[in-house]
């Protein structure tokens, strides 16, 4: 995709489109974003550590793929979709629609105007009045189908509790398949050398996308498991502080 300085935003299939017009970021902003990305690198290690610790602390119960039922079912659903993605030609228009809808959604959330959206088999476009790093990168870190599935099962669980039941494992598997959709198509799009990641500096964009994907998995794990949010956030904060401390110790040891 093309940086915000251009009049169009295009990419090769399966996601090609336009996110609007804006000035290219200044060198000062790019330098600040580079520094921010460098500072966030320790968080990339903290989030997976937190998920692993939550899984290790999971109560005894049925297991799937050697993991707790929610985590194993989620992973199984993602793997099954990945196999289907490799074995069967899934229409690219499904991802193009999700990709452009996510651009538009985050554009609206940021207060911009979305004036036009086009979705076709091999390409798509959306006009956003004030593109920025978040709405430009949103399709790469916000798995819209998985979020929709989580919200759907969350509402259903208000009527029919699913945690610890077979229905909960099925729900986790469906959410995992939806996340697999996001990962497979996003990786396929990134292999086309998307210029979206270059607009605000590749390192900043890469770190932000990876970190927000990790954070989504963290919150999805909490949502699908019996884990309470507040203790889970406490674990994440503690491991984040530990990772940053380790990072700073290593950095100053080399100075």
Question: What is the predicted function of each stretch?
Answer:
Residues 95-108:
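Active-site recognition of the HExxH zinc-binding catalytic motif
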């Amino acid at each position: 995709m093309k940086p915000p300085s251009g009049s169009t935003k295009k990419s090769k299939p399966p996601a090609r489109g336009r996110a609007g017009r804006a000035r290219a970021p200044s060198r000062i902003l790019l330098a600040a974003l580079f520094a921010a990305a460098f500072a966030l690198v320790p968080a990339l290690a903290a989030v997976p550590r937190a998920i692993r610790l939550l899984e290790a602390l999971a109560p005894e119960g049925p297991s799937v793929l050697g993991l707790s039922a929610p985590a194993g079912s989620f992973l199984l659903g993602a793997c099954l979709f990945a196999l289907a993605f490799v074995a069967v030609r899934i229409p690219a228009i499904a991802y193009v629609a999700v990709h452009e809808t996510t651009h538009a959604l985050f554009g609206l959330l940021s207060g911009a105007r979305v004036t036009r959206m086009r979705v076709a088999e091999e390409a798509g476009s959306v006009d956003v009045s004030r593109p920025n790093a978040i709405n430009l990168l949103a399709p790469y870190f916000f798995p819209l189908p998985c979020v929709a599935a989580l919200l759907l099962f969350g509402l259903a669980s208000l009527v029919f509790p699913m945690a610890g039941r077979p229905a909960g494992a099925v729900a986790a598997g469906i959410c995992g398949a939806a996340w697999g959709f996001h990962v497979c198509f996003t990786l396929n799009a990134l292999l086309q050398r998307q210029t979206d990641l270059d607009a605000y500096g590749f390192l900043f964009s890469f770190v932000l996308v990876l970190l927000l994907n990790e954070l989504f998995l963290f919150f999805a794990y909490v949502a699908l498991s019996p884990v309470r949010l507040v203790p889970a956030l406490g674990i994440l904060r503690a491991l984040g502080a530990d990772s940053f401390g380790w990072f700073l110790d290593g950095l100053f040891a080399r100075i």
